[in-house]
Every structure is written in structure tokens, then in C-alpha cells.
């Protein structure tokens, strides 16, 4: 199956006179199932709709919007696989030097706040065209939200973008329903009933009777306590079974969030990943320059989506939901055989997983009938008694992949949830993970070691991680392997004081670890942690918490994790002095730094 058209010449070659949809994306067009643009476009194609891709249009050029003419049914707009502001800026708000989703890594080929800019330009050239926005940037900004880069609460992106309809979450079924209704003759303004969408109205009579009324934009913009309360209502209404419609007044309009789209069945997941992807970047874009984002995912396999891990700093609950959706073994093997047939395949499957590699089934049987629990998490602070812990099916897939002709090694790199591994009374998965699926080092995410901070993060306590580490190295010894463990660590998370950061530094000292990279907490839209950062409250309890907000303190906490780096000496010295931890300044084996000369 050829690539979808990215210019007028290709549109003509595809015998398209007037496309049903023009898909505007902030990414370079890669026809691979790891890219939402490719999935949605191929789904539409499967159901008989024509789609042309307008990849990274230059908003300064008026003519770019006329490349395919105006679409018959509507414009589809996303910023790409990543929020455009996260894509462009570090947590320190410095401009990044490269863009992995752009040919040649060139930064600036998409604008800041890409969806807003794209839609405003489309509205200028096609005032009556239907505009539908989706993807991560739209999904996580679907209602009023704290924006770290402006340091203020912004309105729903459907207001600022002038879009007609917003698709949130994973939109395969939603976009087909929208397309079918538009094709039947309904106007975009009629589509106020579709699950997994957000719409706006000035007509109070259109608001569903069952809708929960949220505090207004003006109120949450000025009152942090109200902001936290509003966020928790949103957070607890992400489930397709238990979730209610939400209504947020925004000045002279109302923003309505319809209930979430139901999770895909296994058969539906297979249909998505069996679509005829080319599995690489469009050749015209490759001529301009390599798209680095393809490197890791080209020979990787996604087997699931959704996550019930409940990490506070993660947006998965708000975007993909807590119900695990997974593919069948047959579907995974079919994709593996496609990868093996790639002339550039060297025998190594880079990854087999998803948001959490070893979540292959829903957390419990009741989720599919009654929905997820709104008043508790599956794993934190302790695992629910109804949690099903079973790696059997995932392990069966890995074993089958290992035996395929042409495969030398199958790696698992996409976030093994170590607590779930430890809760499994059967060691087969852990043993085979260590024996066959680690590429020299296993990356896991304890994130911190202070239990106070871990509770705010929604992560298991340090004691469980210590048990995991011990067992990991024992298995390596039993298997006569010398493999390492790389812990992901986060500095400056809400609730983390200098004393907590020092506890983490002491742990790093004690295990002899020298981290090359540190993730400073990044307040991205629609997470619990970002709400903590903005409000100074834990929205689950409404109790005040300490927030390391100044760039200087964040730099000190980050430096403590890398205290061995001579460049960090002054910051580490200042942090230890502020915390009165002079016992860690000296020449003893427990000291972090030497005294100043």
C-alpha cells in the first residue's frame, strides 16, 4: 500500500479529485503505527475515506493551505506525537536544539502551540470548513489547564484554536463515527453526542442534564483550591462506564466534555495494527533529512495501550485511560514477520511493549463490567486485593518471538513495572526477562527513594524497589550474567524538599551509581503532579505540600543527584549548607563533596 499523498502531484496519482480530509500534522509524516497521524489516516482510508497529509506546513505561507484544495468533509489537526511546547522547550524553558520528529532534526518546523496556530490559519483561509483537533496536545488541553510555559491557566484549546470539535484519547473509533455522520450530511455543529469528544456552545439548553458542572474558567484561573477540586472531578471521570459528561463555563461559552470512548476490544486492536503501514518515513521527507524518532520504533512492536500504574506525573490516565487494551499473539507475530522482511532489519526487535510493557490485561475482571474505581488506585499505596498478577500471556508472546527465524534478540525496553513483577508469585517472567530480553542493562523507574515523595508520585516505597534490585542481581548471578540496572530518577517533584533530594543523593552514593541524565520534574498539562505544582496542594487530600519552584532550587536538587560532577560542586555545597548537612562535606567515605580549598 503506497504512502498517503503529501502533495498535489501524489494526490493526482492517487486519483483523488477532492480529498475527504486534509490532515495537518506538526510531525514529519511517518507511516508507522507509533504515529497517531498514520493510525487515524489509515483507519479513515480503510473505511473508504480519502486523506491527504499536510506535514509541518509553513504557517507564513498562505498558499500552503491550498495544496489539496479545501477538503470535502473537514480538516484534521494535531501537533504531532508530542505537545509542541514540550517538543520545543526543556524544563528550564530553554529552546531545544533538535526536533526528533522533523527531517534532519531541524527545530522550528512546527510553531509553538501548533494546534492553535494551524487552526487559526485554516479558519482564515476556509472560514466555513469543519476543523477537528486531536492528539496529545488537544487531548490534555481539552478543558482549562495550567500552562507551565505561560505560568497561567489557559482556556480549553478548543476555544483558542477556533476548532469545531476536539477528539480526546485514542481516536480510531471516534474519527470513523465523525466521518460517517459528516458524510451522511450532518453538519459539524450537529455532532454534540459523540463519545470521546469535546465541543463548545453558547446555548445552555444543549448541555446534557447528566453533566457535572465544573467551576468556571474565571474562577479556577484565580482560585487554586478550586482549580485542584476541578481537576479531581476531571481525573475521576475518565472512565467510559462510570464517567459523566462535564460542563465548564468559559466566559460566554460552555465547554462540554462527553464521556470517554469505550476501550478497544482485542479484535479492534488487531484491526488497527494490521492496517497497511509502510513502517517508515515518507521518502520525500527522508530526502530532506532523517527523522530520528523512527530509529527506536521502526523495529519495535506495540502490544498494549492504557495504564493503571497511577503515576501522578504521567498523563496516561487522562489520555489513554486506565483499562489495558492488548493485541492478540497472532497480530503481534504478523507484525514481527513484517519487521523481519525489512531489508534493514538486523535481527534485533528493539522493544515489545507499550506504556507499561508488562501490563497485558486489565487490572481486574470488574473493570470491563463496572469500570475503574474512582476512589482508589490499582497499585498504590498497596496493590488492590482484586489485582490480577499474571505474566503468562506476555511471556508466551516473547517466547514465540524468540523462536522466529530471522530474530537474534528480542528486547524489552518500554518500562517494565517492577512492582508488578515483584507481586507475581511465579518467577518465570522475571527469570526469562533477565535471561533473554535485557540489552546489557535494564531500565526501571523507581523515580525517588524518599517515601514521602514516592507517595505524592503514586509510586511504591523504596523497600519494594530494594527487594527488586536484590532479586534482579541474584537472577543475574544464577544465570551467570553480568547485567546492570539503570534507575530513572526525578528531581524537584512536588513535595521534594532539599532534605529529600539529599536522601536521594545518599542513596546514589551508597549504590555507587553515577547517573548521566536526570529528569527534572516537568509540569505538563493534565497531570496530578502539575496540579500539585500549580496549586501547592495534593488534590487527592487537599493538604498543602512543599513545591520547589525556583529555577535555582530545582538546579540544586538536580545537582545533588549528579553530585560527583565537578560542575555541580557550588550548587551541591550550597544545598548541603542550607540543609545543615555539614556531615556530608569532608573526606569521609560517606561525604558527598570535599570542603572548599
Identify the residue ranges that each predicted region occupies.
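Radical SAM enzyme core and accessory elements
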Residues: 2-6, 221-261, 268, 274, ...
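Conserved SAM/AdoMet-binding glycine-rich loop
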Residues: 23, 39, 54, 58-59, ...
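N-terminal pre-triad scaffold of radical SAM enzymes
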Residues: 24-27, 288-315, 348
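Glycine-rich beta-alpha loop elements in corrinoid/cobalamin-binding modules
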Residues: 36, 55-250, 561
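Terminal amphipathic helices with adjacent charged low-complexity linkers/tails
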Residues: 60, 189-238, 252, 261-264, ...
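Flexible glycine/acidic-rich beta-alpha junction loops that bind and position SAM and/or redox cofactors
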Residues: 83-92, 140-142, 172-177, 202-205, ...
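Conserved, mostly hydrophobic/aromatic
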Residues: 164, 272, 311, 332, ...
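Cysteine-centered iron-sulfur cluster-binding motifs in ferredoxin-type domains/subunits
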Residues: 300-313, 322-326, 331, 335, ...
